[in-house]
Amino acid sequence: LLNFAWPQFKFAPRQWLIALACGGIAGLAAPGFDQWYLAWFAFAPLFLLIYANNSYIKQIMLAGAFGLAYNLVYLHWYLNLAPLDWLGFTGAFGYLLAMLAWISVSIHQALAFILFAAIVSRLPLSGSFTAKRGPKKVWLVPALVVLPIAWVLIVNKLGNMPDLMGVPWTMLEYTQYKQPAVLQSA
């Protein structure tokens, strides 16, 4: 019981930089930046980072870094709440509170990305379009079907539930609000 050892993994700065940069780029698809097309490409590195690593801890930490960068960029408007004179917090303290709210909500929303990576990284996925039997006679399900379903259920539905204090402002579908043809085809 006392022989606990922290999981070891090799620190790879390039993977962390990719996670943070791609999360920030995905955040630029938010309304206000109007770079809607970035949402179609910026999430692919997240899936690759999850499946390119064998360490479970590293998978969820990279997903958390991606989610944090995504939410920090997407929720940039929190900084416009300052100065908080209307709440009685003047000067630098109002700016500090706005920044604290921005960071804390971004961290909280990044937890949905961590949960997504924690669940999806354990699923037996295949790159084919149909389910097939893999090694050890385990059925591999197509990633093209499972990943979108998992994203909607975990990040959109569970991560944004008001009961869990989720905020629905960073939902991926909001990035496409000026693309009615894309929305109608879904």
Regions found by a protein language model. Name each.
Residues 1-186:
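Membrane-embedded alpha-helical bundles of multi-pass enzymes
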